UniProtKB/Swiss-Prot annotation:
HAMAP family: Succ_CoA_beta (MF_00558). This is Succinate--CoA ligase [ADP-forming] subunit beta. Its cofactor is Mg(2+). Its EC number is 6.2.1.5. GO terms for cellular component: cytosol; succinate-CoA ligase complex. The gene is sucC. It comes from Deinococcus deserti (strain DSM 17065 / CIP 109153 / LMG 22923 / VCD115). Mg(2+) binds at N192, D206. The keyword Metal-binding applies.
Length: 385
Protein backbone atom coordinates (compact mmCIF):
# COMPACT_ATOMS: atom_id res chain seq x y z
CA UNK A 1 0.00 0.00 0.00
CA UNK A 2 1.39 3.35 -1.05
CA UNK A 3 1.07 6.13 1.49
CA UNK A 4 0.70 9.82 0.85
CA UNK A 5 3.56 12.07 1.86
CA UNK A 6 1.74 13.28 4.97
CA UNK A 7 0.96 9.71 6.03
CA UNK A 8 4.54 8.59 5.54
CA UNK A 9 5.70 11.56 7.59
CA UNK A 10 3.27 10.66 10.36
CA UNK A 11 4.72 7.15 10.62
CA UNK A 12 8.27 8.50 10.62
CA UNK A 13 7.29 11.02 13.30
CA UNK A 14 5.97 8.16 15.45
CA UNK A 15 9.43 6.61 15.30
CA UNK A 16 11.13 9.86 16.30
CA UNK A 17 12.20 11.18 12.90
CA UNK A 18 12.35 14.98 12.66
CA UNK A 19 9.87 15.82 9.87
CA UNK A 20 8.76 19.10 8.35
CA UNK A 21 5.61 20.60 9.89
CA UNK A 22 2.55 20.41 7.69
CA UNK A 23 -1.23 20.07 7.62
CA UNK A 24 -3.66 18.61 5.09
CA UNK A 25 -6.20 20.80 3.29
CA UNK A 26 -9.05 19.85 0.99
CA UNK A 27 -10.24 23.32 -0.03
CA UNK A 28 -8.48 26.58 -0.96
CA UNK A 29 -9.97 28.20 2.15
CA UNK A 30 -8.37 25.53 4.34
CA UNK A 31 -5.06 26.17 2.57
CA UNK A 32 -5.35 29.87 3.39
CA UNK A 33 -6.23 29.14 7.03
CA UNK A 34 -3.20 26.88 7.49
CA UNK A 35 -0.91 29.46 5.90
CA UNK A 36 -2.34 32.07 8.27
CA UNK A 37 -1.72 29.81 11.27
CA UNK A 38 1.90 29.28 10.28
CA UNK A 39 2.43 32.99 9.72
CA UNK A 40 5.25 32.42 7.25
CA UNK A 41 5.75 31.32 3.61
CA UNK A 42 4.42 27.84 2.88
CA UNK A 43 4.62 25.20 0.19
CA UNK A 44 1.40 23.69 -1.19
CA UNK A 45 1.97 20.09 -2.29
CA UNK A 46 -0.42 17.80 -4.18
CA UNK A 47 -1.08 14.47 -2.47
CA UNK A 48 -1.26 11.77 -5.14
CA UNK A 49 0.39 8.38 -5.49
CA UNK A 50 2.65 9.24 -8.43
CA UNK A 51 6.04 10.83 -8.88
CA UNK A 52 6.82 14.00 -10.75
CA UNK A 53 4.40 16.23 -8.83
CA UNK A 54 6.72 19.22 -9.06
CA UNK A 55 7.20 18.93 -12.81
CA UNK A 56 3.43 18.67 -13.24
CA UNK A 57 2.84 21.90 -11.30
CA UNK A 58 1.63 20.14 -8.18
CA UNK A 59 4.13 21.74 -5.78
CA UNK A 60 4.09 25.52 -5.38
CA UNK A 61 5.88 27.96 -3.09
CA UNK A 62 3.49 30.46 -1.52
CA UNK A 63 5.01 33.57 0.13
CA UNK A 64 1.65 34.89 1.39
CA UNK A 65 -1.65 33.41 2.54
CA UNK A 66 -3.39 34.90 -0.51
CA UNK A 67 -0.86 33.21 -2.79
CA UNK A 68 -1.39 29.98 -0.86
CA UNK A 69 -5.14 30.27 -1.52
CA UNK A 70 -4.46 30.89 -5.22
CA UNK A 71 -2.11 27.91 -5.45
CA UNK A 72 -4.61 25.76 -3.59
CA UNK A 73 -7.20 26.62 -6.25
CA UNK A 74 -4.75 25.67 -9.00
CA UNK A 75 -3.63 22.36 -7.52
CA UNK A 76 -6.87 20.99 -6.06
CA UNK A 77 -8.74 19.23 -8.85
CA UNK A 78 -5.62 19.07 -11.00
CA UNK A 79 -4.99 15.90 -13.00
CA UNK A 80 -1.51 14.45 -12.49
CA UNK A 81 -0.80 11.38 -14.62
CA UNK A 82 -4.41 10.27 -14.53
CA UNK A 83 -4.99 10.95 -10.84
CA UNK A 84 -7.12 13.81 -9.52
CA UNK A 85 -5.72 15.87 -6.66
CA UNK A 86 -8.30 15.88 -3.86
CA UNK A 87 -6.09 17.16 -1.07
CA UNK A 88 -2.86 19.02 -0.53
CA UNK A 89 -0.22 19.16 2.17
CA UNK A 90 0.61 22.67 3.34
CA UNK A 91 4.08 22.80 4.88
CA UNK A 92 6.26 25.51 6.34
CA UNK A 93 8.70 26.65 3.67
CA UNK A 94 12.40 25.99 4.22
CA UNK A 95 15.24 28.05 2.78
CA UNK A 96 16.91 25.30 0.77
CA UNK A 97 19.82 27.56 -0.19
CA UNK A 98 20.76 27.89 3.48
CA UNK A 99 21.60 24.20 3.81
CA UNK A 100 22.25 20.96 1.95
CA UNK A 101 19.92 18.33 0.52
CA UNK A 102 20.66 14.61 0.85
CA UNK A 103 18.89 11.35 0.06
CA UNK A 104 18.36 8.35 2.32
CA UNK A 105 16.14 5.36 1.70
CA UNK A 106 15.43 1.73 2.56
CA UNK A 107 14.30 -0.88 0.04
CA UNK A 108 13.72 -4.60 0.00
CA UNK A 109 16.67 -5.89 -2.03
CA UNK A 110 15.80 -9.34 -3.33
CA UNK A 111 19.32 -9.85 -4.69
CA UNK A 112 20.69 -10.07 -1.15
CA UNK A 113 17.38 -11.22 0.37
CA UNK A 114 17.36 -8.40 2.87
CA UNK A 115 16.85 -4.68 3.31
CA UNK A 116 19.29 -2.27 1.76
CA UNK A 117 19.98 1.20 3.09
CA UNK A 118 20.80 3.73 0.39
CA UNK A 119 22.34 7.17 0.86
CA UNK A 120 23.47 9.86 -1.54
CA UNK A 121 24.71 13.43 -1.39
CA UNK A 122 22.61 14.06 -4.53
CA UNK A 123 19.43 14.88 -2.63
CA UNK A 124 16.44 16.63 -4.15
CA UNK A 125 16.78 14.69 -7.43
CA UNK A 126 14.96 11.57 -8.57
CA UNK A 127 17.15 8.76 -7.26
CA UNK A 128 16.56 6.81 -10.49
CA UNK A 129 18.24 9.62 -12.41
CA UNK A 130 21.22 9.55 -10.07
CA UNK A 131 21.44 5.75 -10.38
CA UNK A 132 21.44 5.98 -14.17
CA UNK A 133 23.91 8.86 -14.54
CA UNK A 134 26.25 8.46 -11.55
CA UNK A 135 25.59 5.17 -9.74
CA UNK A 136 28.82 5.56 -7.78
CA UNK A 137 27.19 8.43 -5.89
CA UNK A 138 24.73 6.06 -4.22
CA UNK A 139 26.11 4.26 -1.17
CA UNK A 140 24.42 0.96 -0.32
CA UNK A 141 24.54 -1.03 2.90
CA UNK A 142 22.77 -4.27 3.72
CA UNK A 143 20.57 -4.12 6.83
CA UNK A 144 19.99 -7.28 8.83
CA UNK A 145 16.21 -7.44 9.47
CA UNK A 146 16.84 -9.16 12.82
CA UNK A 147 19.30 -6.71 14.34
CA UNK A 148 18.26 -3.66 12.35
CA UNK A 149 20.56 -0.79 11.42
CA UNK A 150 23.16 -0.08 14.09
CA UNK A 151 24.18 3.53 14.84
CA UNK A 152 27.81 2.95 13.92
CA UNK A 153 26.74 1.48 10.57
CA UNK A 154 24.56 4.51 9.88
CA UNK A 155 27.43 6.90 10.68
CA UNK A 156 29.74 4.92 8.42
CA UNK A 157 27.25 5.15 5.54
CA UNK A 158 26.77 8.89 6.11
CA UNK A 159 30.53 9.45 6.00
CA UNK A 160 30.95 7.34 2.85
CA UNK A 161 28.12 9.27 1.18
CA UNK A 162 29.82 12.59 1.97
CA UNK A 163 27.20 13.93 4.35
CA UNK A 164 28.04 17.05 6.36
CA UNK A 165 26.52 18.40 9.55
CA UNK A 166 25.79 16.64 12.81
CA UNK A 167 26.59 13.09 11.72
CA UNK A 168 25.38 11.60 14.99
CA UNK A 169 21.93 13.14 14.50
CA UNK A 170 21.87 12.18 10.82
CA UNK A 171 22.82 8.62 11.75
CA UNK A 172 20.12 8.61 14.44
CA UNK A 173 17.53 9.67 11.84
CA UNK A 174 18.67 6.86 9.52
CA UNK A 175 18.38 4.32 12.35
CA UNK A 176 14.86 5.51 13.20
CA UNK A 177 13.85 5.46 9.52
CA UNK A 178 15.09 1.87 9.21
CA UNK A 179 13.22 0.92 12.38
CA UNK A 180 10.02 2.34 10.87
CA UNK A 181 10.63 0.37 7.67
CA UNK A 182 11.21 -2.90 9.48
CA UNK A 183 8.37 -2.61 12.00
CA UNK A 184 5.86 -1.41 9.41
CA UNK A 185 6.80 -4.07 6.82
CA UNK A 186 7.75 -1.43 4.27
CA UNK A 187 9.07 -2.35 0.83
CA UNK A 188 10.18 1.23 0.28
CA UNK A 189 10.93 4.21 2.49
CA UNK A 190 12.59 7.35 1.17
CA UNK A 191 13.48 10.70 2.66
CA UNK A 192 14.25 12.95 -0.26
CA UNK A 193 15.34 15.53 0.38
CA UNK A 194 16.81 15.10 3.80
CA UNK A 195 17.67 18.72 4.55
CA UNK A 196 20.55 19.69 6.81
CA UNK A 197 20.50 23.38 7.76
CA UNK A 198 23.18 25.61 9.23
CA UNK A 199 22.58 24.07 12.67
CA UNK A 200 23.53 20.65 11.29
CA UNK A 201 20.20 19.11 12.34
CA UNK A 202 18.53 16.83 9.73
CA UNK A 203 14.93 17.46 8.66
CA UNK A 204 12.78 15.21 6.44
CA UNK A 205 11.21 17.48 3.82
CA UNK A 206 9.60 14.85 1.59
CA UNK A 207 8.96 11.15 1.98
CA UNK A 208 7.81 8.06 0.16
CA UNK A 209 6.47 5.13 2.16
CA UNK A 210 5.08 1.90 0.76
CA UNK A 211 3.93 -1.05 2.86
CA UNK A 212 3.90 -4.64 1.63
CA UNK A 213 0.29 -5.43 0.72
CA UNK A 214 0.81 -9.00 1.93
CA UNK A 215 1.63 -7.70 5.41
CA UNK A 216 -1.32 -5.34 5.80
CA UNK A 217 -3.10 -7.82 8.06
CA UNK A 218 -0.48 -6.90 10.66
CA UNK A 219 -1.25 -3.20 10.36
CA UNK A 220 -5.00 -2.93 10.75
CA UNK A 221 -4.54 0.51 12.30
CA UNK A 222 -3.60 1.73 8.82
CA UNK A 223 -6.43 0.01 6.92
CA UNK A 224 -8.46 3.22 6.71
CA UNK A 225 -5.54 4.97 5.03
CA UNK A 226 -5.95 3.03 1.79
CA UNK A 227 -7.70 5.11 -0.86
CA UNK A 228 -8.53 3.19 -3.99
CA UNK A 229 -9.55 6.38 -5.74
CA UNK A 230 -6.06 7.76 -5.09
CA UNK A 231 -4.37 4.79 -6.73
CA UNK A 232 -3.86 4.50 -10.45
CA UNK A 233 -6.99 3.01 -12.11
CA UNK A 234 -4.85 0.48 -13.98
CA UNK A 235 -3.28 -0.75 -10.73
CA UNK A 236 -6.75 -1.19 -9.24
CA UNK A 237 -7.90 -3.13 -12.32
CA UNK A 238 -4.74 -5.24 -12.25
CA UNK A 239 -5.42 -6.24 -8.64
CA UNK A 240 -8.81 -7.61 -9.73
CA UNK A 241 -7.06 -9.92 -12.19
CA UNK A 242 -4.48 -10.89 -9.59
CA UNK A 243 -1.62 -9.40 -11.60
CA UNK A 244 1.56 -8.06 -10.09
CA UNK A 245 1.39 -4.67 -11.81
CA UNK A 246 3.10 -1.36 -11.23
CA UNK A 247 2.47 1.74 -13.34
CA UNK A 248 5.65 3.46 -14.47
CA UNK A 249 6.38 6.63 -16.44
CA UNK A 250 7.60 5.30 -19.79
CA UNK A 251 6.20 4.52 -23.24
CA UNK A 252 6.79 0.76 -23.67
CA UNK A 253 4.36 -1.66 -22.07
CA UNK A 254 6.19 -4.62 -20.54
CA UNK A 255 4.69 -8.06 -19.97
CA UNK A 256 6.47 -11.22 -18.84
CA UNK A 257 6.14 -14.39 -16.78
CA UNK A 258 7.93 -14.14 -13.46
CA UNK A 259 9.23 -11.15 -11.52
CA UNK A 260 12.83 -11.84 -12.50
CA UNK A 261 12.22 -11.89 -16.23
CA UNK A 262 10.01 -8.79 -16.00
CA UNK A 263 12.69 -6.89 -14.05
CA UNK A 264 15.21 -7.93 -16.70
CA UNK A 265 12.80 -6.75 -19.37
CA UNK A 266 12.60 -3.31 -17.76
CA UNK A 267 16.39 -3.07 -17.89
CA UNK A 268 16.48 -4.21 -21.52
CA UNK A 269 13.91 -1.57 -22.51
CA UNK A 270 16.00 1.12 -20.82
CA UNK A 271 19.07 -0.21 -22.60
CA UNK A 272 17.20 0.07 -25.91
CA UNK A 273 16.69 3.80 -25.42
CA UNK A 274 13.08 3.85 -24.21
CA UNK A 275 11.40 3.73 -20.81
CA UNK A 276 9.05 1.06 -19.48
CA UNK A 277 5.46 2.15 -18.90
CA UNK A 278 4.72 -0.62 -16.44
CA UNK A 279 5.77 -3.77 -14.65
CA UNK A 280 3.37 -6.64 -15.37
CA UNK A 281 4.00 -10.21 -14.23
CA UNK A 282 1.41 -12.70 -15.53
CA UNK A 283 2.82 -15.44 -13.30
CA UNK A 284 3.59 -19.05 -14.10
CA UNK A 285 1.30 -21.34 -16.06
CA UNK A 286 -0.76 -18.49 -17.49
CA UNK A 287 -3.48 -19.55 -19.91
CA UNK A 288 -4.63 -17.63 -22.99
CA UNK A 289 -7.35 -15.81 -21.02
CA UNK A 290 -4.79 -14.46 -18.55
CA UNK A 291 -2.57 -13.21 -21.37
CA UNK A 292 -5.62 -11.69 -23.08
CA UNK A 293 -6.50 -9.74 -19.93
CA UNK A 294 -2.90 -8.65 -19.49
CA UNK A 295 -2.71 -7.31 -23.04
CA UNK A 296 -6.08 -5.60 -22.56
CA UNK A 297 -4.81 -3.93 -19.39
CA UNK A 298 -1.57 -2.67 -20.94
CA UNK A 299 -3.40 -1.48 -24.06
CA UNK A 300 -5.63 0.78 -21.97
CA UNK A 301 -2.61 2.83 -20.91
CA UNK A 302 -2.46 5.93 -23.12
CA UNK A 303 1.25 6.27 -22.31
CA UNK A 304 1.99 2.95 -24.01
CA UNK A 305 3.06 3.31 -27.63
CA UNK A 306 4.38 -0.23 -28.09
CA UNK A 307 4.34 -3.48 -26.10
CA UNK A 308 7.30 -5.73 -25.32
CA UNK A 309 6.39 -9.30 -24.35
CA UNK A 310 9.17 -11.46 -22.95
CA UNK A 311 8.26 -15.08 -22.17
CA UNK A 312 10.43 -18.03 -21.24
CA UNK A 313 8.11 -20.99 -21.27
CA UNK A 314 8.40 -23.59 -18.56
CA UNK A 315 5.01 -24.20 -17.03
CA UNK A 316 3.85 -21.24 -19.11
CA UNK A 317 3.15 -22.56 -22.60
CA UNK A 318 4.22 -20.28 -25.43
CA UNK A 319 1.21 -21.26 -27.56
CA UNK A 320 -1.16 -20.13 -24.79
CA UNK A 321 0.60 -16.76 -24.78
CA UNK A 322 0.26 -16.52 -28.55
CA UNK A 323 -3.44 -17.43 -28.39
CA UNK A 324 -4.11 -14.68 -25.85
CA UNK A 325 -2.33 -12.04 -27.92
CA UNK A 326 -4.05 -13.15 -31.12
CA UNK A 327 -7.49 -13.05 -29.50
CA UNK A 328 -6.82 -9.50 -28.28
CA UNK A 329 -5.96 -8.58 -31.87
CA UNK A 330 -9.12 -10.20 -33.25
CA UNK A 331 -11.30 -8.42 -30.67
CA UNK A 332 -9.85 -5.04 -31.63
CA UNK A 333 -8.28 -4.55 -28.20
CA UNK A 334 -4.73 -4.70 -29.50
CA UNK A 335 -4.03 -1.61 -31.62
CA UNK A 336 -0.40 -0.98 -30.67
CA UNK A 337 2.63 -2.83 -32.05
CA UNK A 338 3.68 -5.89 -30.06
CA UNK A 339 7.27 -7.06 -30.24
CA UNK A 340 7.72 -10.48 -28.68
CA UNK A 341 10.39 -12.90 -27.62
CA UNK A 342 8.93 -16.28 -26.74
CA UNK A 343 11.12 -19.29 -25.97
CA UNK A 344 10.62 -22.63 -24.29
CA UNK A 345 7.62 -24.94 -24.00
CA UNK A 346 5.46 -25.01 -27.18
CA UNK A 347 7.63 -22.35 -28.83
CA UNK A 348 7.20 -23.86 -32.31
CA UNK A 349 3.43 -24.01 -31.92
CA UNK A 350 3.39 -20.34 -30.91
CA UNK A 351 5.42 -19.37 -33.96
CA UNK A 352 3.04 -21.30 -36.20
CA UNK A 353 -0.02 -19.59 -34.72
CA UNK A 354 1.49 -16.13 -35.15
CA UNK A 355 2.66 -16.91 -38.68
CA UNK A 356 -0.90 -17.91 -39.57
CA UNK A 357 -2.23 -14.55 -38.37
CA UNK A 358 0.57 -12.72 -40.18
CA UNK A 359 -0.19 -9.30 -38.68
CA UNK A 360 2.35 -6.46 -38.82
CA UNK A 361 1.21 -5.49 -35.32
CA UNK A 362 2.62 -8.71 -33.84
CA UNK A 363 6.22 -9.61 -34.55
CA UNK A 364 8.46 -12.24 -32.94
CA UNK A 365 12.22 -12.01 -32.52
CA UNK A 366 14.81 -14.63 -31.53
CA UNK A 367 16.22 -12.65 -28.59
CA UNK A 368 14.78 -10.31 -25.99
CA UNK A 369 17.32 -7.66 -26.98
CA UNK A 370 16.05 -7.56 -30.57
CA UNK A 371 12.42 -7.51 -29.46
CA UNK A 372 13.07 -4.72 -26.96
CA UNK A 373 15.03 -2.71 -29.53
CA UNK A 374 12.13 -2.88 -31.97
CA UNK A 375 9.56 -2.01 -29.31
CA UNK A 376 11.66 0.98 -28.27
CA UNK A 377 11.94 2.16 -31.88
CA UNK A 378 8.19 1.87 -32.39
CA UNK A 379 7.39 3.70 -29.14
CA UNK A 380 9.86 6.52 -29.68
CA UNK A 381 8.76 6.98 -33.28
CA UNK A 382 5.11 7.21 -32.21
CA UNK A 383 5.95 9.84 -29.60
CA UNK A 384 7.93 11.86 -32.13
CA UNK A 385 4.89 12.26 -34.40
Amino acid sequence: MKLHEYQGKEILRQFGVNVQDGKVARTPDEVRQIAREYGQPVVVKAQVHVGGRGKAGGVKFSPTEDKAFENGEKILGMDIKGLTVNKVLVTKAVDIDAGTEYYVGMIVDRNVQSFTLMASAEGGMEIEEVAAATPEKIIKHRVDPVTGLRPYEAREVAIRAGFKGNLNKIADMMVKMSEAALKRDAVLVEINPLFVGPDGVPLALDTKFEIDDNAMYRHQDLADWRELEAEHPLEIEASKYGFAYVKLDGNVGVLGNGAGIVMTSLDVVNRAGAKPANFLDIGGGAKAEVVYNAVKLVSKDSDVKAIFINIFGGITRADEVAKGVIQALKDGILTKPVRMRIAGTAEDEAKALLAEVNSPLIQMYPTMFEAADEAAKEANAAEAK
